Design a protein with these regions (language model features):
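Aromatic (Trp/Tyr) and acidic
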Residues: 1-128, 133-135
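Short strand-edge motifs at loop-to-beta-strand transitions and within beta-strands
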Residues: 110, 152-156
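Short beta-strand segments within Ig-like beta-sandwich modules, predominantly Fibronectin type-III
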Residues: 144-150
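Short, surface-exposed beta-strand/strand-loop-strand elements in extracellular ectodomains
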Residues: 134-142
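Short, well-ordered loop/turn sites that connect or cap secondary structure elements
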Residues: 160-163
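Short, solvent-exposed loop/turn motifs
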Residues: 95, 143-144
Length: 180
């Protein structure tokens, strides 16, 4: 993943997110699970065969989804793709649990709750997608602590306490893009 080599480049995560929503999820056949191909030219190739050589790869995507949500390095956590769930993260200072709550992409509201047995000095990087309609304020326990521009990461470096809550909302707008 190029994102691991260049973590400040949001465009790599955007490509992963776009592929997940527009290709991986779109490849599902309602009658027979994940069994047809969605080519990038917009056509879908259906077959009468139940299994193809790539069927295992399509299924593997869903098993690897947790790897796409967060990137961790030392005491820095990047929140890359938004989905409800729980991360148990072993930092240099101990275990931190991060609970993410969202209905993304149906709405842009996202909450992160941190839990630990002691305060931790951490850096949290929250992805602000390139398609966000405007800058995004990030609130810690109700107070703005960072603002992120579309196509970047909002960064919060501080000592976090157990029970801290981060809230932000990705403003979405309907846009049309030509397919090249």
């Amino acid at each position: 993943r190029l994102h691991r080599l260049f973590p400040d480049n949001e465009s790599y995560v955007f490509e992963m997110e776009e592929s997940l929503y527009n290709i991986a999820f779109a490849n599902q056949n309602g009658d027979r699970e994940i069994r047809y191909y969605a080519y990038l030219d917009g056509n879908k190739s259906r077959s009468d065969f139940l299994y193809h050589c790539c069927a295992g790869i399509g299924s593997r995507i869903f098993g690897s989804l947790p790897e796409y949500l967060f990137t961790m390095k030392d005491s820095t956590l990047s929140v890359d793709i938004f989905a409800s769930g729980t991360l148990t993260w072993e930092t240099p200072y101990g275990i931190v649990t991060v609970r993410e709550e969202t209905d993304f992409p149906y709405n842009g509201r996202i909450s992160l709750r941190l839990e630990s047995d002691a305060p931790h000095e951490l850096t949290l990087r929250i992805r602000i997608p390139c398609y966000a309609a405007k800058e995004v304020p990030v609130l810690l326990n109700g107070k703005i602590v960072a603002t992120g521009k579309p196509g970047s990461y909002a960064t919060i470096a501080r000592i976090f306490q157990s029970g801290d809550r981060l809230d932000f909302e990705i403003p979405m707008a309907l846009t049309a893009h030509p397919y090249d």
